[in-house]
Amino acid sequence: MMLKTAVRLSLLACCSAVLAAPATAQTPTPAPAPAPAQSAAAAKGTPPPPPPLLQIEREEVRPGKGAAHTANEAAWAAAYAKAQSPVQWLGMTTVSGPNEAWFLTRHESFAALEKSDASTDANPALSAERDRVAAVDGDLLTRSSTILARYRPGLSYQPAVNLPSMRYMTVNIMRVKAGHVEDFLEGWRMVVEAHKKATMDEHWAVYEVESGMPDTTFLFLYARKSLAEIDASGPMHVAAGYRDAMGESGRRNMNEASRSGIEMTQTMHFRLRPGMSNLGKEWAETDAFWAPPAAVPVKTAQKK
């Protein structure tokens, strides 16, 4: 029970930077584009801060349709590449639980999001291909939804990470009870300060949902190079350094705030999927993991 509690605390106390995009809706061409998933400078060692606005396309895939869905997502990327659209997104699929695919894209504001959508609609060829691929998606999914969430820097800790080097993303969904939001915010600011004091080797970004999920829902996002990081996360939060930084009263107050103020939590682990993403060439230049798969040569029958 103690280990389970420690692991859960670690999941509630860490998460990391985001970027990327949706497999539907979003799409600019001539008008102001959303900020790129990660700039070349960022990929080379200066990670950008999390975007002010995050858009998430959440898709639930029908049983047995995973391979077909993966192939159709590649068609999305091909359509945007052909149209030379600046829209970029990061695709990822669940490691456990229901078969879901999430597509994340960054925006500077709601105005930028609106211009992005308008510019895609103004491109007839891209719009037509988008509608065609979306129709195929409809036969592969049981449900899809769009989530818009705003970045909360005061609740985040060392959020800028070198995303091209990451392979997994954990999302912890927390819904706060009405009337308890201020206590929740105060508690998490205390967690951030304790992490700073203990110089914890963690990174997370927090987003508050604006639409697409119930109000007072917060998303804690953290990127991982390996799932093995989860093994170290639990013990790290019960070690003396962090316990001293939180203090006995801090731990007691945080536990009480969680019991009385949190309506629900859900933790989801995702694997990042290059083939379902549409990212800048700097990603592949930084890490070959993101390079498009080489075309398989077609063998022709030899003449007899």
List the predicted regions and their residue ranges:
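Bacterial N-terminal signal peptides that target proteins for export
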Residues: M1-A13
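C-terminal segment of classical bacterial N-terminal signal peptides
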Residues: C14-A25
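Short S/T/G/P-rich N-terminal loop/turn motif that feeds into the first structured element of a domain
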Residues: A25-K304
